[in-house]
Amino acid sequence: MKIIFFLCSFLFFIINTQCVTHESYQELVKKLEALEDAVLTGYSLFQKEKMVLNEGTSGTAVTTSTPGSKGSVASGGSGGSVASGGSVASGGSGNSRRTNPSDNSSDSDAKSYADLKHRVRNYLLTIKELKYPQLFDLTNHMLTLCDNIHGFKYLIDGYEEINELLYKLNFYFDLLRAKLNDVCANDYCQIPFNLKIRANELDVLKKLVFGYRKPLDNIKDNVGKMEDYIKKK
């Protein structure tokens, strides 16, 4: 009788463990798909296209071009672009504001404040629906900037908040992707092709995922880079 009871308990434990693993797997995949869509949409909205704001009666336009040269394939790092099966990336966190250089865009490409505001606000509201507490303050701040044309110009001219948002979204994508690969490490579940971590990404992702837990190491690394930069100058 005791043996039967033990076997039933053991069987229940195995089934329950598999159910928990399955629920964790489904939840992770759902979150990752939402994050992937958010980063790709943000990349298309803010970096792939050029934003030209028509200021109305003045006839002038403010052009925002693709920031930097980060539009290449990334390997899971914090600052890249859309990677095949890897990090879906954004620009860097960008602590200083930048003035985007004007290019060949003409005034005919300019869109009204109402049109651009609608697109940006819809995107930011989608980000809020992801319910990441760490993004609430930033998205609320960006939504406030969208409330008037001067704040909106500040937002799309400087790109500081935009870069920070895309950087954080990409960071969470990499973090959860590493967690998913860990959950499925013992073949409990099958990892979707676009969420797999490949060998050439592993080292970069280790630094990214574990690096945020070691702020002192990150600070030392940043100081070292700054010292090298000063020496070159």
Curated annotation (Swiss-Prot):
Q: Where in the cell is it found?
A: Cell membrane; Secreted
Disordered: annotated segments: 58-110
Q: Which GO terms describe its cellular component?
A: extracellular region; plasma membrane; side of membrane
Q: Which residues form the signal peptide?
A: 1-19
Q: Does the keyword Cytoplasm apply?
A: no
**Per the UniProt entry, what species is this protein from, by scientific name?**
Plasmodium falciparum (isolate CDC / Honduras)
| Ranges of compositional bias, category Gly residues | 74-94
Specify the glycosylation sites in chain numbering.
Answer: 104
Q: How does it sit in the membrane?
A: Lipid-anchor; GPI-anchor
User: Keywords on this record?
Assistant: Cell membrane, EGF-like domain, Glycoprotein, GPI-anchor, Lipoprotein, Malaria, Membrane, Merozoite, Repeat, Secreted, Signal
Key word Lipoprotein present: yes
The record describes its quaternary structure and partners as: Forms a complex composed of subunits p83, p30, p38, and p42 which remain non-covalently associated; the complex is formed at the merozoite surface prior to egress from host erythrocytes. Forms a complex composed of processed MSP1 subunits, MSP6 subunit p36 and MSP7; the complex is formed at the merozoite surface prior to egress from host erythrocytes. Within the complex, interacts (via subunit p38) with MSP6 subunit p36 and (via subunits p83, p30 and p38) with MSP7 (via subunit p22). Forms a complex composed of MSP1, MSP6, DBLMSP1 and DBLMSP2.
PTM per Swiss-Prot/TrEMBL: The p190 precursor is cleaved by SUB1 prior to merozoite egress into 4 subunits p83, p30, p38, and p42 which remain non-covalently associated. SUB1-mediated proteolytic cleavage occurs in an orderly manner; the first cleavage occurs at the p83/p30 site, followed by cleavage at the p30/p38 site, the last cleavage occurs at the p38/p42 site. The order of cleavage is essential for parasite viability. SUB1-mediated processing is essential for merozoite egress.
Residues passing through the membrane, by range: none
Q: Show the taxonomic lineage.
A: Eukaryota, Sar, Alveolata, Apicomplexa, Aconoidasida
Q: Where is the composition biased (Polar residues)?
A: 58-67, 95-107
Q: List the disulfide bonds.
A: none
Protein's UniProt name: Merozoite surface protein 1
Function comment: During the asexual blood stage, involved in merozoite egress from host erythrocytes possibly via its interaction with the host cytoskeleton protein spectrin resulting in the destabilization of the host cytoskeleton and thus leading to erythrocyte cell membrane rupture. Involved in the binding to host erythrocytes and is required for host erythrocyte invasion.
Principal localisation: membrane
